[in-house]
């Protein structure tokens, strides 16, 4: 009986601790109240018309070539719409059409960078309610390829700079604005930017690029309308070529069974069904959960407020929710191609490993290699890129998060790991705090329209994003 009472006491104490932690989490959290930026009809009309003109420029980037026709058209639109920026900022083109503006600040020894890209992916007319490059303005929205990815944030950045110059505001530090012309291809625009910065000794305290946005709550049952999701890390890429060959006749007693295609298939089956990679609750994911916990309902609030107890469970459960959630826990593996036939003497496959942590990746590759050796498969590295995470302990990270609380007080903000790819990784050698975040508000439909039909943004979302950029720059310390 004593044991039973002891067990019950432990359960009661544990439940009390969990509930107290949840209550403390809520008590310490920022209250979601306050006013968001508002705009006159005339201001919104100006934003809409300029944004529409930018979307009418079909700046589709094409591999291995650059036709400047539509890009030149966009440059002309931007020069006309933002005259003060082009009069007062230092401007140059890198590569064929990567824009770089510099607005000197009061402290010319320090730099911040707002970046975007103005190239877009192709768009077919089929499936669109309006022509993809019409820039149609309908019901408070502007439609067109590139609206969300990422001419919207670029338009907001340019408006912010123009409006500050019109008001006679000098940024506290040097403000750089960079927009690439071939981000969608993984082109040389940002590579040229990095080369220029390194050659001229330019480093940045903080960089803001695309990636995260202001979106509908990522977790069910949250007590908020939208969330500011700030990507502080981008998963690295390791591409391997896997090769298996038929052994020569003098090794016919080999332990390997089956022809190359069979062995490769068995290898892929084992890799994709076994959990051979390290999984953990990374700091970025921990920050995501703790940032959103106060605004969740029970029982989710209880789980996220007590990661000391439930962290391991969440790490195991996340892959079962969806691929994006699962990818936050560690290395993911995606076989992309396989070549060979039953009668061929060899079979090859390419695989992409996306990793969160560089040290974990070393162990993951060793585990991957061990399985490959069981099937006589050799590995060759074709691509190896690791992207350093932003320093979440730095003032450079804390400041934009504080700006989000000031400009969008009704939306919680939290960090996360970006599963997609951006140009921002190229600039990690010149900045310890690269944030993949554009302050554009998007519904699920708008987020899903990226690289798809009916891409659009609200006019007010562009104006709000410009207000955020202005606040961030003019109050920078």
Map each language-model feature to its residues.
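Feature marks short, highly hydrophobic, charge-poor N-terminal signal-anchor/signal peptide-like helices
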Residues: 1-9
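Acidic/His- and Gly-rich active-site-bordering loop/insert found
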Residues: 8-145, 166-171
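Short glycine/serine- and small hydrophobic-enriched flexible loop segments
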Residues: 18, 159-166, 266-270, 471-474
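An extended, acidic, His-containing surface patch that forms the Zn2+-binding/catalytic region
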Residues: 92, 107-109, 215-216, 277-345, ...
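A common structural junction motif
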Residues: 118-119, 271-275, 369-377
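Acidic/histidine-rich catalytic neighborhood of metal-dependent amide-processing enzymes
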Residues: 142, 148-229
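Midchain, well-structured core segments that form catalytic/ion-binding scaffolds
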Residues: 191, 199-362
């Amino acid at each position: 009986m004593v044991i039973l009472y002891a067990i019950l006491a432990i359960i009661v104490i544990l439940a009390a601790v969990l509930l107290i932690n949840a209550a403390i989490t809520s008590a310490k959290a920022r209250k979601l109240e306050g006013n968001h930026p508002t705009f006159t009809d005339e201001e919104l009309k100006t934003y809409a018309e300029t944004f529409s003109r930018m979307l009418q420029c079909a700046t589709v980037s094409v591999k291995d070539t650059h036709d400047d026709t539509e890009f030149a058209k966009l440059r002309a639109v931007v020069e006309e719409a933002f005259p003060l920026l082009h009069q007062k900022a230092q401007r140059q083109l890198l590569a064929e059409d990567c824009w770089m503006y510099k607005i000197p600040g009061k402290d010319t020894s320090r730099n911040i960078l707002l970046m975007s890209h103005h190239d877009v992916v192709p768009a077919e007319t089929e499936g669109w309610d309006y022509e993809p490059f019409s820039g149609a303005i309908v019901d408070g929205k502007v439609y067109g390829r590139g609206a969300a990815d990422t001419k919207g944030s670029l338009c907001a950045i340019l408006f912010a700079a123009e409006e500050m110059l019109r008001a006679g505001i000098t940024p506290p530090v040097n403000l750089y604005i960079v927009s690439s012309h071939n981000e969608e291809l993984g082109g040389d625009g940002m590579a040229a930017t990095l080369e220029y910065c390194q050659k001229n000794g330019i480093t940045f305290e903080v960089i803001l690029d695309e990636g995260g946005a202001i979106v509908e709550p990522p977790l069910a049952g949250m007590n908020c309308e939208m969330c500011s999701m700030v990507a502080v890390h981008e998963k690295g890429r390791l591409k391997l070529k896997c090769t298996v060959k038929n052994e020569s006749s003098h090794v016919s007693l080999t332990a390997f069974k089956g022809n190359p295609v069979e062995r490769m298939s068995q290898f892929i089956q084992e890799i994709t069904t076994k959990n051979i990679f390290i999984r953990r609750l990374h700091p970025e994911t921990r920050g995501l959960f703790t940032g959103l916990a106060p605004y969740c309902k029970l029982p989710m609030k209880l789980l996220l407020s007590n990661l000391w107890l439930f962290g391991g469970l969440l790490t195991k459960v996340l892959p079962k929710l969806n691929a994006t959630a699962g990818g936050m826990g560690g290395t993911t593996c995606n076989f992309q191609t396989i070549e060979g036939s039953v009668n061929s003497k060899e079979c090859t496959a390419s695989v992409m490993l996306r990793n969160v942590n560089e040290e974990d990746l070393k162990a993951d590759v060793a585990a991957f290699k061990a399985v490959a050796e069981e099937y006589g498969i050799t590995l060759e590295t074709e691509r190896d890129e690791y992207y350093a995470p932003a320093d979440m302990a730095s003032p450079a990270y804390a400041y934009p998060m504080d700006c989000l609380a000031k400009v969008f007080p009704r939306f919680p903000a939290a960090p996360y790991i970006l599963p997609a790819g951006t140009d921002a990784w190229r600039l990690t050698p010149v900045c310890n705090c690269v944030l993949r975040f554009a302050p554009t508000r998007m519904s699920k439909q708008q987020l899903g329209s990226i690289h798809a039909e009916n891409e659009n943004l609200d006019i007010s979302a562009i104006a709000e994003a410009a207000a955020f950029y202005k606040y961030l720059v003019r109050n920078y310390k």
